[in-house]
């Protein structure tokens, strides 16, 4: 039986966390610098533990104004400090709840920059390794960040997206472009099954891009997204694909 991990961003202030955590195998918990805060983090950790969902840290640039989606030119030392701050905050909450962090997935602009920028990718990988060498680093399948992480002796998780279109080079179509998102549930489900069962995805130019699908990112920031997440779970189970971290 094929297996796949399902992850989503949690503790960002949306009202669907508890419902979403009943569908997921992994939760990317926001660490307060792009959204959410201590209260949301603690609730998310509790819910994740109750539902036996793997916990991941979801650090970002310090950018609450733009939800962490704006690229920032931080020095290496500034980025290290912000990463340590966020990882440390989530670890403290996990320690208090008897839970553990298993992986790190950068958020938004930090995720996208690290996928292509060696300097940023290496700072992230080295900071994570120094914080806890047993943590895994989750990132875009085939990205530079995952290659750098492996060089830095970190285990990695290759991630694919249910609701994003892909460029021919395997990167995501930028949100600034009108065709960035997969709007149709039917198309998104077809894309998920193609990535999980065949290891490939159709790029916007029609070419086939090979992808290593170890975890699927879902979004749950509105009611439609929650219903869509339920449909993804149903389709995976229907195709005998086990959801597990």
Swiss-Prot record:
Its EC number is 3.5.2.9. GO terms for biological process: carbohydrate metabolic process. It is an enzyme of class 3 (hydrolase). GO terms for molecular function: 5-oxoprolinase (ATP-hydrolyzing) activity; ATP binding. The keyword DNA damage does not apply. It catalyses: 5-oxo-L-proline + ATP + 2 H2O = L-glutamate + ADP + phosphate + H(+). Catalyzes the cleavage of 5-oxoproline to form L-glutamate coupled to the hydrolysis of ATP to ADP and inorganic phosphate. Forms a complex composed of PxpA, PxpB and PxpC. Belongs to the LamB/PxpA family. This is 5-oxoprolinase subunit A.
């Amino acid at each position: 039986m094929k297996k796949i991990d399902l992850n989503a961003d949690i503790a960002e202030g949306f009202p669907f966390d508890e419902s979403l955590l009943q569908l997921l195998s992994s939760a990317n918990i926001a660490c307060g610098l792009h959204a959410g805060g201590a209260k949301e983090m603690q609730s998310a950790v509790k819910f994740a533990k109750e539902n036996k969902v793997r916990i991941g840290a979801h650090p970002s640039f310090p950018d609450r104004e733009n939800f962490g989606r704006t690229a920032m030119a931080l020095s290496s030392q500034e980025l290290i400090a912000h990463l340590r701050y966020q990882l440390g905050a989530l670890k403290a909450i996990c320690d208090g709840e008897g839970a553990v962090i298993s992986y790190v997935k950068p958020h938004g602009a930090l995720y996208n920059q690290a996928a292509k920028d060696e300097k940023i990718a290496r700072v992230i990988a080295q900071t994570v390794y120094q914080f806890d060498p047993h943590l895994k680093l989750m990132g875009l399948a085939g990205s530079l960040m995952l290659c750098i992480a492996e060089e830095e002796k970190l285990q990695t998780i290759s991630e694919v997206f249910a609701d994003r279109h892909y460029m021919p080079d395997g990167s995501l179509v930028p949100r600034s472009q009108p065709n960035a998102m997969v709007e149709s549930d039917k198309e998104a489900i077809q894309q998920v099954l193609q990535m999980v069962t065949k290891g490939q995805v159709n790029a916007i130019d029609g070419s086939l891009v090979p992808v290593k699908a170890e975890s699927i990112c879902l979004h749950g920031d509105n009611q439609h997204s929650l219903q869509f997440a339920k449909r993804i779970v149903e389709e995976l189970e229907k195709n005998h694909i086990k959801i597990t971290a």
